[in-house]
Amino acid sequence: MSADAAAGAPLPRLCCLEKGPNGYGFHLHGEKGKLGQYIRLVEPGSPAEKAGLLAGDRLVEVNGENVEKETHQQVVSRIRAALNAVRLLVVDPETDEQLQKLGVQVREELLRAQEAPGQAEPPAAAEVQGAGNENEPREADKSHPEQRELRPRLCTMKKGPSGYGFNLHSDKSKPGQFIRSVDPDSPAEASGLRAQDRIVEVNGVCMEGKQHGDVVSAIRAGGDETKLLVVDRETDEFFKKCRVIPSQEHLNGPLPVPFTNGEIQKENSREALAEAALESPRPALVRSASSDTSEELNSQDSPPKQDSTAPSSTSSSDPILDFNISLAMAKERAHQKRSSKRAPQMDWSKKNELFSNL
């Protein structure tokens, strides 16, 4: 995209709403065949109208988080989790179409880039993150630390007349138990529980590796109140990169540090060396075990003790050599045993004497 085209491109709108006695005063809906969530209706005199929200606007971000690929319930949960104020980045249909033709990705940085002094080409500069003006990426970075501090959340709720107001499900593609949906105005919603959250703990007990029935039983065992430690998708991925299971210590304490590629390679090499050290004697153990088994099987045919007949020059460090010698010895002993079972030779004079008696 050329700089001239970017400079003349329309911009999205940032609407900051403060909740009134009757809420924010707008209705959200999804349209068939279109990705995303749209403003269906804006009530007259409402905080939404005062903030400049318009019917037909497409919702792009909620409090700096992109929601273009999220479900209706997920977007609603994000808005309600903001409590008394919310920041919505929206585009009207005409602006949305023009930005798509120009290949400009809709985000809040476009507005900050335009407001930055001495910035001749705001959209172009916003497109190249980390290049150009040094101040702009710093401003963008400053807007995310709160949102990017990925911590688990402790959701405490008391059972209402209709229960807690959330549904639990498991996903075959990934381990764990997840929140499928949260009912509006339910105890679960009031506690901050969101759709797609993964349950880590129930009432202080870790649920890692537990089955669906185990998690349900743990929740029911809490009676009319339960505490769920949960992580959203991004937080879950962060802790997996750190190789740490989230806990209540991470609610306010220091966060773990993700493994870098070098550290992962070092860790893998250490594990490989440890495994090699453990596995390296195994072939010898297998051979010696099979040798012992052969000795036991052969000993059934050769009762004599083996210690007295084993050659002293044989090295015990070579199980293969021991195995070959034991076979040879076994054959010799078997031959000796068969020979020892034969009847002694009788001379002809004794035979004649025996037959004459009969």
From Swiss-Prot:
**UniProt keyword terms in alphabetical order:** Acetylation, Cell membrane, Cell projection, Cytoplasm, Disease variant, Membrane, Osteoporosis, Phosphoprotein, Repeat, Wnt signaling pathway
Where expressed (tissue)?
Answer: Detected in liver, kidney, pancreas, prostate, spleen, small intestine and placenta, in particular in the syncytiotrophoblast.
| Domain spans labelled PDZ | 14-94, 154-234
| Posttranslational mods | Phosphorylated on serine residues.
Q: Which residues carry this modification: Phosphothreonine?
A: T293
Q: Which GO terms describe its biological process?
A: actin cytoskeleton organization; adenylate cyclase-activating dopamine receptor signaling pathway; auditory receptor cell stereocilium organization; bile acid secretion; cerebrospinal fluid circulation; cilium organization; establishment of epithelial cell apical/basal polarity; establishment of Golgi localization
- Gene3D superfamilies found in the cross-reference section: 2.30.42.10
* Listed Basic and acidic residues bias regions: 135-152, 348-358
Q: Where is this region: Disordered?
A: 114-192, 277-358
Coiled-coil-forming residues are: none
Membrane topology reported for the UniProt record: Peripheral membrane protein
MF terms from GO for this chain are: beta-2 adrenergic receptor binding; beta-catenin binding; channel activator activity; chloride channel regulator activity; dopamine receptor binding; growth factor receptor binding; identical protein binding; PDZ domain binding
Q: State whether keyword Electron transport applies.
A: no
Cellular component GO terms, alphabetical: actin cytoskeleton; apical plasma membrane; brush border membrane; cell periphery; cytoplasm; endomembrane system; extracellular exosome; filopodium
The N-acetylserine modification is found at S2
Outcome of swapping F355R: Loss of MSX binding
Q: What does this protein do?
A: Scaffold protein that connects plasma membrane proteins with members of the ezrin/moesin/radixin family and thereby helps to link them to the actin cytoskeleton and to regulate their surface expression. Necessary for recycling of internalized ADRB2. Was first known to play a role in the regulation of the activity and subcellular location of SLC9A3. Necessary for cAMP-mediated phosphorylation and inhibition of SLC9A3. May enhance Wnt signaling. May participate in HTR4 targeting to microvilli. Involved in the regulation of phosphate reabsorption in the renal proximal tubules.
What is known about its subunit structure?
A: Homodimer, and heterodimer with NHERF2. Binds the N-termini of EZR, RDX and MSN. Binds the C-termini of PDGFRA, PDGFRB, ADRB2, NOS2 and CFTR. Binds ARHGAP17, EPI64, RACK1, OPRK1, GNAQ, CTNNB1 and PLCB3. Binds PDZK1. Interacts with CLCN3. Binds the C-terminus of PAG1. In resting T-cells, part of a PAG1-NHERF1-MSN complex which is disrupted upon TCR activation. Forms a complex with CFTR and SLC4A7. Forms a complex with SLC4A7 and ATP6V1B1. Interacts with TRPC4 (via the PDZ-binding domain). Directly interacts with HTR4.
Entry protein name: Na(+)/H(+) exchange regulatory cofactor NHE-RF1
Which species is listed as the source?
Answer: Homo sapiens (Human)
Question: Taxonomic lineage of this organism?
Answer: Eukaryota, Metazoa, Chordata, Craniata, Vertebrata
Gene (name only): NHERF1
